[in-house]
Amino acid sequence: MDVSRVNVKRAPCALCTTKNKRCPKKCDFAPYFPAERKGEYENAHKLFGTSNIIKMMRFASKDKQRDMLASSILMEGDAWKKDPARGGFGMIQKLKWQIELRKIYLNELKEKIKVEKEKTELRL
């Protein structure tokens, strides 16, 4: 059997699926918005709209830039899905708050260690 004649079907990318159009074999957006990430893309689509996503992706000239941009678009969409009031800013606030709590906990542990060392030195 001639391997070159075998048609490998891939699912249409999330962008083409959202636009209800046929996804061409050399779709510019398939590497960045594969079918497996459809849910993430839908979140981004609700936030930015497909036409704005296309404009942003076309503005990024290099593959590395497009890769980072697509990742950012998907993350921002998910952030707004999880926190509709604050989006990515809310996630950053939450992480900063968690860091502050961990710092307080770490300082408490350091203080306990200091006290235990002093007790141990007094016993010797």
UniProtKB/Swiss-Prot annotation:
Transmembrane segments: none annotated. Residues 11-113 form the LOB domain. It comes from the Eukaryota. InterPro entries: LOB. Pfam families: LOB. PANTHER family: LOB DOMAIN-CONTAINING PROTEIN 4-RELATED, LOB DOMAIN-CONTAINING PROTEIN 5-RELATED. Belongs to the LOB domain-containing protein family. This is LOB domain-containing protein 9. The lineage of its organism: Eukaryota, Viridiplantae, Streptophyta, Embryophyta, Tracheophyta.
